[in-house]
Each structure stands twice: as C-alpha cells, then as structure tokens.
C-alpha cells in the first residue's frame, strides 16, 4: 500500500515532562517519527510541554507548540490548526490518554480529525482491563484469573474466592502507578484505595499473583496489510512481580527452548493481529519455567520504553517505521535503514547479548522504600552489548555510575548472612550484588533460585564470574587468565584489585601484550548482509570492524543514564554538540550507554560507540580512533569527572582546560579566583573534620549550608539551623576526611538568579538571565525559573552581567558556563559556577533563539563568537514571558519527603509561555500537573519562622473567596490578624484531623513549610506525603505566592463597599 495522499497535516502529541515511567525514550521516538513523516512530505505539527527535548526544536516539525498537554490546550491547537490527522502513539501514556479524552469530548469529530496508527478501539481494548480480558478469552489466550473492581467491597469478594497473594493494577495509569502485590488485608486496603484514586476511570484489575514466573517480552510490528514481525524478544532476569522498567533485561531471551520461543511468538503475533494495531506494540508474557504453561500479562499498544530498548538492541528503528506505517506504508515496501538493502519485513537476528539495567534514584532519596514491585521506581537505564552474557552484564554494571566497577558492593560484603538472604528473597535495587556475594560465600545456585525465583541459567552465569575471581586471585600476572577475564567483561579496576596493582598497571600490561578489544558492528542481521550503520560495541575477539577514516575526528562523551540531577537536558546538549562538530567539518564520534536517548540513535553521529563511560572503556576508543581531541562539557558531571584521568593518560581535552575546570570546582582555588576578580560570595570555609565544621559554623553563624565538594544536583546538601542538626548531617550524609572535605557556607536568604553564558576567551555572550521564584536554598533544578527577570533592578542586572563576563574571562572559559547568584537587596553574591553545559541550556536556547550548544562547540573548535555575529553582554530580551516549572515523581516514591531544599528532587520540567507572567505561570503549573481551582479551600500549616509572611498570603486567599483551614498554631496567628479561619486538628488528634481533610478532598491546595522533620514519622512529613492523593502541596511560600498571583489574575475580587472604606 502506498502512502496516503488524502491527508496533509498531522498533529503529533509528545509525552510531556520526564517522570518515573516515562522518560527520554519518548523524545527519541517522537523525534524519529516527526522526521520520518516530514521525509514522506507531510506537514507536521508537534505539541509537547517539555522544553528539554530535541523533538521541540524548530527544525524537527513544521510547527512546534510548547503548551500544556491538557484537553483544553490541545483542543485549542486543533481548532486553530485544523490538522487532518493526529498521531498519539508516540507520546507514551500521556499521548494515549489525551487521544481518548479528545475523542470523548467530541473535539476530533467536530474538527474532522482522524486518529492514525493504532485506532481508538484498539487502544481501549488493550488499555481497558475488562475489554482486554474479554478479547483474550475469545482468542483462547490464557490470562491470570482476575476481577475488575470499582470498590473495596468488590476487592474483598474476589480475594475470598482465590486467596492471597493478588496483584492490583489500576486502569489507564503509567508505570504501574498505584499498583502493587498484596499478601494480606492491610496491604489490600492500602493499595486498592490508592489505586482507585489514581485511575482516571476509578477502576482496578485484581488478579491472581503469578509472581515468580519468567517474564518475557515481545516487541512486534504490524502494518495495514496484516504483515506482522517480531523485532526483538527480551527476557527479564527478575521474575514476574517486578515492573519490567525496574527489571534487568536481556535480549535476545537466553533461557527459552525453541518450542517455548515459537509458542510465545505465535501468541504475540495473534494478539497484535486481533487488536488490529498498526505500528509497534509490546506484549508481556509470563512463562512457567517448569512447564509450557504461560499467561498473557499485558499489551502496550504504543511505542514504549521496551521499544526504545529493542531499537537500540537490534538497530531496527521501530518508531520511525511505526510512523510510516501510520500513513499507510507497509513493511515489505520500506527499506531497513540499518542495512540500506534488506526490507523492513526481515526479522532482526542478533549475534550478541544485550543487557539493560535500570538506574534508581535512591542515592538521592536515602529514606525511600527500595523494595521493587509492580510500581516503577527507576528514573533511567543503561544498556550494554557483549558477545557473552557475562561480558554484557559486567559492562552494564560499570555503566551505572553508582561507584562500582564490578559485581561488588561494600554493603553486601559486610552484610550478615540473614540480612543477605532477606535482600535476595525480597527484591531491591541491589539484589544482583547480594547474589554475587552469596555465591562467594558458597551458597548454591539451587538455594539462590529458591530464594529469588531467578532462572538457574542466569545464576550459573554469575557463578562463572565469581569463579573467575578466584582464578585471577591465584594467578597474578598470568596473561592467559587475563585474556579470559577480559573476555568475561572484567574491568581493569576489578583485575587490579585482585592482583594488588593499579588500574593503569593492568592497562599498560594489556597494551604491551596486545590484549585489547576489537569493535563489532550492530547490523540487525547477524552479519548476513553488509551494513551501513556505524554503530559499534567492544569485545575481546580477533577481527575489528570499526574502520578509522582519514578525516580528523572529535569524540564527545555523553551523559549516561538519566537520574535526578542529570536528565535529558544533557543529552540535548550532546546532540547539538555532535551536529556542530559535523558542520565544522570534523567526523563526530559519540560514546554513550543510554538506550532511551536521541544521542544514541545511530543516525545522529558519524560513529556511535555503545560503551560504559569509564576511563578504561573510553581510552580504548581513543586509542583506536586517535581523535583531534575529546569534548567533556556536554555530558554533565559524568564526563567532567573523567577529565582528570583522561588528561593524565595523555588525552587532549578541547575547550576549557582541566586546570580551569578545577579552578571552578575546587573550593579554595575558586575563592582565590573570586577575590582576585573582586567578586563577592557568601562567607564560608572548608572543613576536613567534624570538629572543624562545627567551629566554622559557629564563627560565621547559623543557618549554614553544608555540602560535599564536587557534586551534581546538590546531592547530600542541606541547610542546618543549629549544632545538633549539623552533627546529625556530618554523621549521616557524608564521610568527611582530608580527601573528601565538606563546605560550610553562610546561608543568605535572597533571590536566586541563574545565568548561562558562552565564551571563546574574548567574547562572552549571555543569552538571558533567569530569576527563580523560590528563594536561595531551593536547588536551582527544583525552582520555578522566569525569563525575563520580573523584579530585578537595572543596577542588579548590570552587576550580574559584569560578574559573569569577569568570571568567564578570569576562568578562561572556552565553551559554556553556568553561574548561580543570590541577590539580597542591591548586593549580588556568587553561589557557584559550573564550567559546563547545564540543565537550563535547552530552555534558554529555545526561548532566546540563541543556539547555545552549537555556538559553544564551535568556540571549543576554535571559531570566534564575534565572527558569528555575537558580542559581549546580554542578548536583547525577547517579547513574552517564559517560565520553567519542575515536575516531580513523588507519587511513585514512598517515604520521600517532598519538601524543597538544596538537594534536587525533580525528574523533569515543563515550559509555560504567554504575554504576562501570570498567564505563563498558569500554563506552567497546569502543564506540570497542578490542578488550579479558582475557588475552594486552602489548608495552611507553617513553621514559626514563616507565620508572619503567611498572614499576608492568607488574607489574599480570603479576598478571592478561598476558605481558609489551618492547624492550631497557624490559625491563632491568622485570627490575631483578623482573618476568618477554620481550625483543623493535628495528625494525632481526633477526627476530622488534617489527614482526613486532605484525604476527603476538602482542601484544593496545601501549604506546608518545613518544621524540621526529615524523618518519616514527623507530622509535616506525613502531611507532605499526601501528594499520593494528588493534591498540590506547596512547601515554599514563594511558590504559594506565585500561585496566588495566578489565581488573582483569574478571579474578580469581591469586597463589599464598606470594607474598602474601613481598610483605607
């Protein structure tokens, strides 16, 4: 079937901000799809609220709308643009749910818009648990016994029939939100209540738990001609019961016999045909390891996290082909872009093993519940490729950047046997390391299988790794053993530890003896046909397939897995850096290991190496390619942290020199630079012991800001108000010693301002200045940022500009620079300087029109900004107001305090743009998922230090007709100021207490500022956790004040005439 000529304009819905369960894989899919549709000659309109994406760049679609992904705003765009069709299957759950809403609201019918790709009925059949179950029964495909419930009573009735354990899955939610496994009544009540609340249709599926079965996934594609193929099948190492997004996954499956493989393949193809899906689809199945029994778990009728993984694992571009299928092309008429020869209807064949390991945010959230279950908790993932499972697994482990270079974890090493067993029986994010430790202690594979339900095949493979450790230990310096160990994926660091040598010794020995990796190509066809894609992985074999060209090359280091503090913004900068290198006439080579992103799409760079970002793995590529130099500015802290080791090994770093990077990162050198330049910063010193920290704090006066040196995303940063808190911090958050000093600074309450600049050694271009709504002390990544600044005087802006230019020149910055200032009155202090690309680069590039990463790269390669038409200073302000609003994933992470502070907690961001600040902020808040109600009740419970300030806010809430509810202390203050208020009891008092009010939906907004209680049992903590009920809870009065401004601009004030007279 040729492509359709009856449609011209297509609206593509993006997936919005990054949250747990919906990350960068949709930027990758959406970018691919928009480009594919443009390639076929269609006009593409994109709507997405996430400014950090490549897909919202103006060149990706013909028109880009960065507006909230809500029924209201998307309907406006449809009415204005009148597209012929809409493609929702690339926007994740957000896109699917919006399509369903637009159809139900009659907007699509009213404007004559057709849904492309998977039809609405198919989406509903796959997503609605009841319809799906009916279809499976019709097809004779087995599903676990289950019941659809809408209330707790119905849940009890089902459990009485089949008994515990049962799995709860809410309908139409993302990443298993609200779901879980219940083994008793208490868990049933809790999980079912939350699940019903979080499901937009108040419906949950309860099913018999088949936890412990092997979990297998098939990624399938089908076109309108009913051609269907399996792109890739994958096996979860963790058994059923753990969300596939939190599971370690291998492709292709390792434990299936041919009969099992065919059985599940046929079921998957039968299901995609019955659903009539046109495009990509993911089928999840559970297989009983001891018989041929299997169950269908679920189907995702859209591009998903698994399809991004399958695309990168096979090289087969699912999203691109899905978009073309949506406009009528068929698999047998499209060429597979990887080989350039075979058609897309050839099923990919793999001659290597791919391993994906999730990256969890628990290094940021120490108190979070680390147990894994049906609700997803990972923020990102890494992928690695090897010739054997062992090699692939070890490469993935060292890609995670969790401070381990092998299957070894200190906590596991020191754990008592009973603790170890518990950690293996109840899966957490570190289970793999405990299994390795158990094998070292002589626990048998059989016992481990019984504890973990993990297939014996994988346990035997891990045992191979452990046995090799012993061989290495017994044969120090033996070259044959060294060769075998490298073949199993051992890192130099792991071998060095077993041989009591340094990592560089092992590396030197290998080079001298010629024990170095070769690079193999990912070609989708197991080398059956020649392939055109320069996409490589390393392995220890004979033949090298990566050919070095004559053209001078530049290597760019990517930013690795997405985690809190280092998100998709860095991938955005990496991609733009690569494009600029190509424009400058060099060959662009990228090294990265994140399967979700655009940077690891093989069509982005001239060569892609899918490798761990460690000194050893990066050096291997450098040794082969001999580049002009390496760029580390765009890969976040991941790349910056490799700079010193690479330079020590003789690598040329391009852009800002290592010495200058160090001057910005090292506290004492930085202070010296500031005093030479005459730029003020808050008083503070460096401590190398607990006693010293206390002495410094008492000298400069509390409150102080404490943090370790060299961190990203404010890890382990805190504001402490007295000696006791400081001691608690020193004991729990950091291990202070002369190698790891702790910084103690005076905490200044003021406005925080953030600036990004581009410098080439002479010219310093400042695209824009952003003012933060939350005062200093809230991490910049968690603050609402506004451009242009709304309250800064010309004098302050001039100071900020002057300091920025002085710093860029004084630190000899070549490339990008990010500075955070705090403004108190007319004084401007520098808080910190990051000599690299930052989180705000995509946002600023888009709203100011200055292509920051592109200019910075050209400056790094030696071009002058003045020759490109830029001059020193702030660029002219663009019309309009733009806000960047952070988005959090708290509903997925239990036991995490949502209060904002110096430690970053947001996973993503959205943009709001309009003509006034209030309108822009309204859009930003709505896009971030905060429901803004023009009337209702606000519940206030604030710390003593905030009471005075809260009075003015409360009065303004009352003036626009909001009812005020408050706890005792706060209520007294309000009454004293003559403001009417209803008292609500504290948590431990009689009903209706504060939690009842929130749970019954009697408050539309909660404002709760920090009473010092970080522990889960404090009242404030429990109030703030009510985000699980989906009510906006603001923990900073600045955010509340901004929201009030929005509400005031939406409502008319109603005051009686006499009131007006009395007040004046």
Curated annotation (Swiss-Prot):
Residues 133-327, 671-861 form the ATP-grasp domain. Mn(2+) 4 binds at residues 832, 834. Its EC number is 6.3.4.16, 6.3.5.5. Pathway: Amino-acid biosynthesis; L-arginine biosynthesis; carbamoyl phosphate from bicarbonate: step 1/1; Pyrimidine metabolism; UMP biosynthesis via de novo pathway; (S)-dihydroorotate from bicarbonate: step 1/3. Keywords: Amino-acid biosynthesis, Arginine biosynthesis, ATP-binding, Ligase, Magnesium, Manganese, Metal-binding, Nucleotide-binding, Pyrimidine biosynthesis, Repeat. It is an enzyme of class 6 (ligase). Residues 930-1064 form the MGS-like domain. GO terms for biological process: 'de novo' UMP biosynthetic process; glutamine metabolic process; L-arginine biosynthetic process. Its cofactor is Mg(2+); Mn(2+). Pfam families: CPSase_L_D2, CPSase_L_D3, MGS. The keyword Nucleotide-binding applies. ATP 2 binds at residues 707, 746, 748, 752, 777-780, 820, 832. Mn(2+) 3 binds at residues 820, 832. GO terms for cellular component: cytoplasm. Residues 1-401 are annotated as: Carboxyphosphate synthetic domain. Residues 930-1064 are annotated as: Allosteric domain. ATP 1 binds at residues 129, 169, 175-176, 208, 210, 241-243, 284, 298. Mn(2+) 1 binds at residues 284, 298. Residues 402-546 are annotated as: Oligomerization domain. Small subunit of the glutamine-dependent carbamoyl phosphate synthetase (CPSase). CPSase catalyzes the formation of carbamoyl phosphate from the ammonia moiety of glutamine, carbonate, and phosphate donated by ATP, constituting the first step of the biosynthetic pathway leading to pyrimidine nucleotides. The large subunit is composed of 2 ATP-grasp domains that are involved in binding the 2 ATP molecules needed for carbamoyl phosphate synthesis. The N-terminal ATP-grasp domain (referred to as the carboxyphosphate synthetic component) catalyzes the ATP-dependent phosphorylation of hydrogencarbonate to carboxyphosphate and the subsequent nucleophilic attack by ammonia to form a carbamate intermediate. This is Carbamoyl phosphate synthase pyrimidine-specific large chain. The lineage of its organism: Bacteria, Bacillati, Bacillota, Bacilli, Bacillales.
């Amino acid at each position: 079937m040729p492509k359709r000529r009856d449609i011209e304009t297509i609206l593509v819905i993006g997936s919005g901000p990054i949250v747990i369960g919906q990350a960068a894989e949709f930027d990758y899919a959406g970018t691919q799809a928009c480009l594919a549709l443009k390639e076929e000659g269609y006009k593409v309109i994109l709507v997405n609220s996430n400014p950090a994406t490549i897909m919202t760049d103006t060149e990706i679609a013909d028109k880009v709308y960065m507006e909230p992904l809500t029924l209201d705003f998307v309907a406006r765009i449809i009415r204005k643009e009148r597209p012929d069709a809409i493609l929702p299957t690339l926007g994740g759950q957000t896109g699917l749910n919006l399509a369903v809403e637009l159809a139900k609201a009659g907007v699509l019918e009213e404007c004559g818009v057709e849904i492309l790709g998977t039809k609405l009925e198919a989406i509903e059949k796959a997503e609605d648990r009841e319809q799906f179950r009916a279809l499976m029964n019709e097809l004779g495909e087995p599903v676990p016994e289950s019941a659809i419930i809408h209330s707790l009573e119905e849940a009890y009735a089902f459990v009485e029939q089949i008994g515990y354990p049962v799995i709860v899955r809410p309908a139409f939610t993302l990443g298993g939100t609200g779901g879980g496994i219940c083994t008793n009544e208490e868990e049933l009540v809790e999980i079912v209540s939350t699940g019903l609340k979080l499901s937009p249709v108040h419906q949950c599926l309860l099913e018999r738990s088949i936890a412990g079965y092997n979990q297998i996934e098939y990624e399938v594609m089908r076109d309108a001609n009913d051609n269907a193929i399996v792109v890739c099948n994958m096996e979860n190492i963790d058994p059923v019961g753990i969300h596939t997004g939190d599971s370690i996954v291998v492709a292709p499956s390792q434990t299936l016999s041919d009969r099992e493989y065919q059985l599940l393949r046929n079921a998957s193809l039968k299901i995609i045909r019955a659903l009539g899906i046109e495009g990509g689809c993911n089928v999840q199945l559970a297989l009983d390891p001891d018989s041929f029994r299997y169950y269908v778990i679920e189907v995702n009728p859209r591009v998903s996290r698994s399809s991004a993984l399958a695309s990168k694992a096979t090289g087969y571009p699912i999203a691109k082909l899905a978009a073309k299928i949506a406009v009528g092309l068929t698999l047998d008429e499209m060429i597979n872009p990887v080989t350039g020869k075979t058609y897309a209807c050839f099923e990919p064949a793999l001659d290597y093993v791919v391993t994906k390991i999730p990256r969890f945010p628990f290094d940021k959230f120490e108190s979070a519940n680390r147990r894994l279950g049906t609700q997803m908790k990972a923020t990102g993932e890494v992928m690695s490729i090897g010739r054997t499972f062992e090699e692939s697994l070890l490469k993935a482990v060292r890609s995670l950047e969790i401070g381990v270079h092998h299957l070894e974890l200190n906590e596991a090493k020191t754990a008592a046997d009973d603790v170890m067993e518990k950690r293996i029986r109840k899966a957490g994010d570190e289970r793999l390391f405990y299994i390795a430790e158990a094998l070292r202690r002589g626990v048998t594979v059989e016992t481990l299988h019984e504890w973990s339900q993990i297939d014996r095949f994988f346990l035997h493979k891990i045992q191979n790794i452990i046995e090799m450790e012993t061989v290495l230990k017994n044969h120090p310096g033996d070259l044959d053993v060294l060769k075998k160990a490298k073949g199993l994926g051992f890192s130099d660091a792991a071998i060095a530890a077993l041989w009591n040598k340094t990592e560089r010794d092992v590396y030197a020995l290998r080079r001298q003896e010629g024990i170095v990796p070769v690079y193999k190509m990912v070609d989708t066809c197991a080398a059956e046909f020649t392939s055109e894609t320069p996409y490589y992985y390393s392995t220890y074999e004979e033949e090298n397939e990566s050919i070095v060209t004559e053209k001078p090359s530049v290597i760019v280091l990517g930013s690795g897995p997405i985690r809190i503090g280092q998100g998709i913004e860095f991938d955005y900068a990496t991609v733009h850096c690569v494009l600029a290198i190509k424009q400058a006439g060099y060959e662009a080579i990228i090294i990265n290991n994140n399967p979700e992103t655009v940077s690891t799409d093989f069509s982005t760079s001239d060569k892609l190496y899918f490798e761990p970002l460690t000194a050893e793995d990066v050096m291997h590529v450098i040794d082969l390619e001999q580049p002009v130099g390496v760029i580390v500015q765009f890969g976040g802290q991941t790349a910056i942290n490799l700079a010193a080791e690479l330079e020590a090994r003789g690598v040329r770093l391009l852009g800002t020199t290592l010495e200058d990077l160090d001057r910005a990162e090292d506290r004492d050198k930085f202070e010296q630079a500031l005093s030479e330049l005459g730029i003020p910063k808050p008083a503070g010193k460096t401590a190398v012991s607990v006693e010293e920290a206390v002495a410094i704090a008492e000298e400069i006066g509390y409150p102080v800001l404490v943090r370790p040196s060299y961190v990203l995303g404010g890890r382990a940063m805190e504001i402490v108000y007295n000696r006791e808190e400081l001691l608690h911090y020193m004991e729990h958050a950091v291990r202070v010693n002369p190698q790891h000093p702790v910084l103690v600074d005076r905490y200044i309450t003021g406005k925080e301002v953030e600036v990004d600049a581009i410098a080439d050694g002479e010219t310093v271009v400042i695209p824009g200045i952003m003012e933060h709504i939350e005062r200093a002390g809230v991490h910049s990544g968690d603050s609402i940022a506004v451009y242009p600044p709304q309250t800064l005087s010309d004098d302050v802006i001039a100071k900020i500009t002057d300091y920025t230019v002085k710093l860029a020149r004084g630190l000899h910055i070549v490339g990008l620079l990010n500075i955070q200032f705090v403004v108190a009155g007319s004084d401007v202090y520098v808080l910190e300087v990051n000599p690299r690309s930052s989180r705000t680069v995509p946002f600023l590039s888009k709203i100011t029109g200055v292509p920051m990463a592109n200019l910075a790269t050209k400056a790094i390669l030696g071009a002058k900004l003045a020759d490109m038409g830029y001059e020193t200073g702030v660029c002219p302000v663009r019309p309009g107001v733009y806000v960047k609003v952070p988005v959090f994933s708290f509903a997925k992470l239990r036991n995490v305090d949502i209060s904002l502070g110096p430690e970053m907690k947001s996973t993503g961001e959205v943009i709001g743009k309009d003509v006034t600040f209030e309108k822009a902020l309204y859009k930003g808040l709505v896009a971030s998922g905060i429901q803004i109600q023009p009337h209702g009740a606000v519940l206030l419970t604030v710390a003593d230090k905030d009471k005075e300030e809260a009075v003015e806010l409360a009065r303004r809430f009352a003036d626009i007709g909001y009812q005020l509810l408050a706890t005792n202390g706060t209520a007294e203050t309000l009454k004293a100021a003559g403001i009417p208020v209803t008292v609500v009891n504290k948590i431990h008092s009689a009903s209706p207490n504060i939690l009842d009010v929130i749970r019954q939906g009697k408050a539309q907004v909660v404002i709760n500022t920090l009473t010092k209680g970080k522990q889960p049992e404090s009242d404030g903590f429990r109030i703030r956790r009510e985000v699980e009920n989906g009510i906006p809870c603001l923990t900073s009065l600045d955010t509340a004040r901004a929201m009030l401004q929005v509400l005031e601009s939406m409502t008319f004030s109603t005051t009686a005439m006499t009131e007006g007279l009395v007040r004046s």
